[in-house]
Every structure is written in structure tokens, then in C-alpha cells.
């Protein structure tokens, strides 16, 4: 349900999407279009939400985002670049860095914090899908308007495939 006032500039949001009889995403809050820059104030709950829907957001920085997410977070602020606040647990997750030609699975459940415009990865055990080398990932992936992306990632490893490109002159 999304209901608007008579001005059609403010909306109450009460939304859910069921997948296989599980409410995989629900959102409750408001959208406000009364100012030049629309605002959002929504609480979101994910339960076994398929992450592959987010792959297009990563464009050429991240791809093949996969796995399922569960957790709660809020979206507040300007609609095009809201602040996020919350925590997610990822299962059977992984992602690819096309520029590095590397693809990783997250071993076990992974904890990801949402803070501002950043996704905070917390001591995640990585396994590269090509050679099965391992390492630990911590750091942030930050966006601006879900368009400009930056990585601030630390990888602790004695043996993890970091770059898998061909040498060209």
C-alpha cells in the first residue's frame, strides 16, 4: 500500500514482497515530494532476499552480486542518495570485481553494516572461485547517488588471488 495525501506530494509507504510464501522484503515509512529534493524515511526488513537484484548497481566496479540477505535497516534523507543505517547477514554470498577479473564466495555467513552511503564488510572469509585461495576482507564500498562508487578494502591473506589479468605491453 502506498497512500498519498490530497496534494499527492506526501506518501505513506507500507510495502511487502513475498517470495515462496516468505515476506522477503517489507518497507514502512514515508516519501515526501513537497520540496525540490524529495525525501525518504523508510524502515526496511529483508528476509531471505535474493541479492542478485543489486548486481546492476555495481556497474563495472562490482558484478555477479549473489546470495541471500536478512536484516533490518533504514533509509532516510534525500531520495536519490539516502543515508542507510542497519545490519545485514548474508548467506551463500559472493561477488566479482570485473576490473581485477576475480570472483569470490563469502565463506559461511557474512556480516555487512549499512552506514550512510557505505556498505561495511566485517571480517569476511573470502574464497576465490577459480583456485580456491582464501583471505579475509574488511572495509567499505561507498556510493554517491548509487552512481559514483569507491572501494576502501583491506584484504588479509598469505594466499588469495587478487588480480587475474593477462600481461599486455
Task: Enumerate the language-model features and the residues they cover.
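Interface amphipathic segments
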Residues: 1-169
Amino acid at each position: 500500500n502506498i497512500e498519498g495525501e490530497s496534494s499527492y506530494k506526501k506518501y505513506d509507504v507500507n510495502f511487502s514482497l513475498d517470495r515462496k510464501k516468505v515476506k522477503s522484503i517489507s518497507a514502512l515509512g514515508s516519501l515526501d515530494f513537497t520540496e525540490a529534493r524529495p525525501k525518504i524515511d523508510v524502515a526496511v526488513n529483508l528476509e531471505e532476499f535474493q541479492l542478485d537484484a543489486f548486481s546492476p548497481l555495481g556497474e563495472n566496479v562490482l558484478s555477479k552480486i549473489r546470495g541471500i540477505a536478512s536484516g533490518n535497516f533504514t533509509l532516510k534523507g534525500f531520495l536519490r542518495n539516502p543515508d542507510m543505517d542497519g545490519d545485514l547477514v548474508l548467506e551463500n554470498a559472493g561477488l566479482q570485481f570485473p576490473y581485477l577479473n576475480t570472483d569470490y564466495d563469502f565463506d559461511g555467513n557474512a556480516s555487512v553494516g549499512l552506514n550512510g552511503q557505505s556498505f561495511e564488510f566485517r571480517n569476511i572469509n573470502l574464497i576465490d572461485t577459480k583456485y580456491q585461495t582464501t583471505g579475509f576482507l574488511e572495509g567499505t564500498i561507498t556510493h554517491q547517488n548509487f552512481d559514483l562508487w569507491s572501494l576502501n578494502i583491506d584484504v588479509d591473506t598469505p594466499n588469495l588471488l587478487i588480480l587475474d589479468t593477462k600481461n599486455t605491453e
